[in-house]
Amino acid sequence: MPADFEPLHDARPDCVLCRQHTGVPLWQDAAWRVIRAEDDDFPAYYRVIARHHVAEFSALLAPERQRCMGLVCAIERVLIERLQPTKINLAALGNMVPHLHWHVIARFDWDSRFPQAVWGVRQREVPGGALVRLGESLADLDAAVAQALALA
């Protein structure tokens, strides 16, 4: 697990991702941090967050973009191998929080909103909840993600 979250010297005072630590911290290096979002409907939901404030992917240098995508792919591979989801959703929207971050979300045909987006209209209830249906402990999944990121 990474050290306690500390905003960087260039953190923007009005940026929630610069200033606040949300989610379960799994890994970080000098440029990126990874958390698991705490979402009862989507327990296998991770974010790759730029540690420095940058709004657009194209603002990164080529090696930084490659590193970011390497981290996204490492998480995606773990989710596919361990959970066999119906689909992995990848997104970097930034309309609400203009700080570069990628969402990596395991989706299943049984999840509450499938095939809609995670913010879409609920399609069904999930008996027992999504975590029970996931079939893997979050601690084990988080450990596998952190290990893959350490090797990425």
Task: Walk through the language-model features, giving the residues of each.
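HIT superfamily nucleotide-processing domains
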Residues: 1-152
